[in-house]
Amino acid sequence: MPTAIVVGAEGQDGVLLSRLLRAHDYRVVPVGRHGPVDIVRPDDVAELVAELRPDEIYLLAAVQNSAQDPVADPVELAHRSYAVNTLAVVHFLEAVERHSPATRVFYAASSHVFGRPDTPVQDETTPLRPTSVYGISKAAGLLHCRSYRSRGVFASVGILYSHESPLRRPGFVSRKIVDAVVRIQRGEAYRLVLGGLAAEADWGYAPDYVDAMRRILGLATADDYVVASGVRRTVREFAETAFAAAGLDWRDHVEENAAVLTRPSVPLVGDASRLRAATGWRPSVDFTGMVRALLRAAGADLVGTGQDG
């Protein structure tokens, strides 16, 4: 039975990946905020890796704020971001190099490593130009993976675009829309205030993205891979699709107010051609199917069949 350490096991991706790995007969060792080790302490990480010598390690832990989260203290946010998004990655890579060289490592990077790219669609060759603390710390983690890869460590990187599931935390716009639809349908609310209806994103379904992670570590060689749907959608489209699925007209309930945004959003769209060619990966649901799955999990009563037109 293969052993996998899942770092960030309590988050959306960690929970979904752990379920997937167990379904494939893995022994999963979860590492989260409450232990069993402190990932910012290199000695703790080294001891865990040396003891388990796992087949795979998935580095999914992250410090991230959404565009509609309250503004955090910039210095404190930087310290936390670099500790978790960068230094913890180095601790695991170093531990693997020293104590378990056969271990394969996956690092969850982010489309935010591209910052404000010159191209409308990004791939693995797009220059790293992060503009946020989150993006900078994730880009640093990516570069450390490349460095250790050049020294023989099997360190693959998934550059993940926005991906949603019922486990997404409330601060993200997808969760705000879904929760509002359910409350409105139940008569518990009437209006939803969103920061920018024209804001664009490349949204995918999180269970598909953790499947990509497992496939990436199953390849013969380590590399970087964009994981994305490749389709640009607006917040307006997300709201329209969600309300329509519940038999509601979004225009009756949605109000736009830019004041709720804490930072401007940057439209990022990914090209996952390399991933598809290498692994055969394909999204299992389209955009409408994803939105309906989120609503169904939240308890909404749905209408129609939900196919993208």
Predicted segment positions?
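SDR active-site strand-loop-helix element
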Residues: 7, 31, 57-61, 105-111, ...
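Glycine-rich "substrate-gating" loop/helix at the edge of Rossmann-like oxidoreductase active sites
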Residues: 131, 160-172, 196-207, 231
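NAD(P)H-binding glycine-rich loop region in Rossmannoid oxidoreductase-like domains
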Residues: 43-84
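Catalytic helix-loop patch of NAD(P)-dependent Rossmann-fold dehydrogenases
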Residues: 73-91, 103-104, 112-159, 164-165
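Conserved mid-core alpha-helix of short-chain dehydrogenase/reductase
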Residues: 44, 87-95, 208
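C-terminal substrate-binding subdomain of Rossmann-fold SDR/epimerase-dehydratase oxidoreductases
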Residues: 8, 18, 181-309
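N-terminal Rossmann NAD(P)H-binding glycine-rich loop of SDR-like oxidoreductase domains
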Residues: 4-23
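Adenosine-cofactor binding site in Rossmann-like domains, unifying the SAM/SAH pocket
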Residues: 28-44
